[in-house]
């Protein structure tokens, strides 16, 4: 019987534990795009200057086609605060003085009987939650797709190896070409459908994870 109990408890704890997919550095989803450039035919004019390889001093260096690189300046700050409270009061009062039965007062030893009942209940609950996060930095991403309206789908990642672990930043979203600054940068707050992930792997990242037993006590399966 004890073995079945241990097996059932193990299955329950396994179901309560959450498993997360471990990120990999070479995820194909974030792989850069290398556009295929058509071969250029250079006419033999005998001159050192070639018009096909010339660059204008007034050309726009902002990303506008698939494979171009754009720098995303991370300026994320979120703050959330929530408070809730409720109070329930209930009371009842009953009094019978004196008690009548059969058209006369009920008494014991000549002393009339009376009934008095009073009940009250007061329940008060309060809860507060406060959370704030900020992320500053920059990451260069690739233009993965140019939409019909001219918007650019950008995506990229950056991995940094530090001591016994790796830290990474991943970003994907949609930007307007009009929002790109002349230095080919754009603020992350100007991205639509943005997905920004900053995390890490290794010893230090594992030390911040909650154990399976603690997850059980914080889950809905814990009855108390």
Swiss-Prot record:
Membrane among keywords? yes
Its domain of life reads: Bacteria
Covalent lipid sites (N-palmitoyl cysteine)? 16
| Signal peptide range in chain numbering | 1-15
Q: According to its UniProt record, which protein family does this protein belong to?
A: Belongs to the FlgH family.
| Lipid attachment points (S-diacylglycerol cysteine) | 16
Output the PANTHER family linked to this UniProt entry: FLAGELLAR L-RING PROTEIN (PTHR34933:SF1)
Role noted for this protein: Assembles around the rod to form the L-ring and probably protects the motor/basal body from shearing forces during rotation.
Q: Where in the cell is it found?
A: Cell outer membrane; Bacterial flagellum basal body
Ordered alphabetically, the record's keywords are: Bacterial flagellum, Cell outer membrane, Lipoprotein, Membrane, Palmitate, Signal
Chief place where the protein resides: membrane
GO biological process assignments: bacterial-type flagellum-dependent cell motility
Q: Which gene encodes it?
A: flgH
Report the GO terms under cellular component.
bacterial-type flagellum basal body, distal rod, L ring; cell outer membrane
Entries under PROSITE patterns matching the protein: PROKAR_LIPOPROTEIN (PS51257)
| Protein name listed in UniProt | Flagellar L-ring protein
Record's HAMAP family? Answer: FlgH
Q: Quaternary structure per UniProt?
A: The basal body constitutes a major portion of the flagellar organelle and consists of four rings (L,P,S, and M) mounted on a central rod.
Question: How the protein sits in the membrane?
Answer: Lipid-anchor
GO MF annotation: an example = cytoskeletal motor activity
């Amino acid at each position: 019987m004890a073995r079945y109990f241990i097996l059932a408890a193990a299955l329950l704890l396994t179901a309560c534990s959450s498993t997360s997919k471990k990120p990999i550095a070479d995820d194909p989803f974030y792989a850069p795009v290398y556009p295929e450039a058509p071969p250029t035919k250079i006419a033999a004019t005998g001159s050192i200057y070639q018009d096909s390889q010339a660059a204008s001093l007034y050309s726009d260096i902002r990303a506008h086609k698939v494979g171009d690189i754009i720098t995303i300046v991370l300026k994320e700050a979120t703050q959330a605060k929530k408070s809730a409270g409720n109070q329930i009061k209930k009371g009842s009062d009953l009094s019978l003085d004196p008690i009548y039965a059969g058209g006369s007062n009920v008494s014991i030893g000549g002393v009339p009987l009376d009934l008095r009942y009073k009940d009250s209940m007061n329940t008060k609950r309060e809860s507060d939650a406060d959370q704030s996060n900020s992320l500053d930095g920059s990451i260069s991403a690739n233009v993965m797709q140019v939409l019909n309206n001219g918007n650019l789908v950008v995506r990229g990642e950056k991995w940094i190896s530090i001591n016994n672990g790796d830290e990474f930043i991943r970003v994907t979203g949609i930007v307007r070409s009009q929002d790109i600054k002349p230095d080919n940068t754009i603020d992350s707050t100007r991205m639509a459908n943005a997905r920004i992930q900053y995390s890490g792997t290794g010893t230090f990242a594992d030390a911040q994870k909650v154990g399976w037993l603690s997850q059980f006590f914080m889950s809905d399966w814990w009855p108390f």
